[in-house]
Amino acid sequence: MNDKAFTEIKKGYGSFYKDLLRKGKLPLWSTGKGFWGGVIADEVYEAFKKIKLHKHKTFIDLGSGDGKAVLIAALFCKRAVGIEIDNELFQKSLELQRKLNISNAIFYNNDFHEQSIAGFDFVFVYPDSPMHRGMEKKLLNELTGKLLHYGHHFHPQNLKAQDKFLVNGNLFTVYTR
């Protein structure tokens, strides 16, 4: 954990969102495979502290969007990976990673359904559609660690909830197979 680096991550993403708004764009859009809306940095940072992410080595974000959760996770883990199909969001992840000099984050411009999640200590999702549309099957087949689900919506039906907690009114749930 590094509060100074976290502050820099927040500043970098704040600038990105302000630039979008100046151009008349909202910081959310369709990616062609789903829908992107950014995570709230302070909530994710607090959740990562609560689950003691620093005691784990690997993290993967399925549908990592602009990479914010991955760069925050990289402050805790040895290796943080993000998979994002939208090229503009993928490029923004790489840009902020370089600017912030966070070397233990890795980003792939790909469909996360084609990326194995086996072997990761934590899998992060902020789902944009019901789990029964393919995500839950992937998790049931490949999840070897824990799932950190962000939000009150689209929870898996066949995984076991280990922990649930609120951060600023938003729900985080830890699941296992």
Protein language model regions, located:
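Conserved SAM-binding loop of SAM-dependent methyltransferases across substrates and taxa
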Residues: 68-77
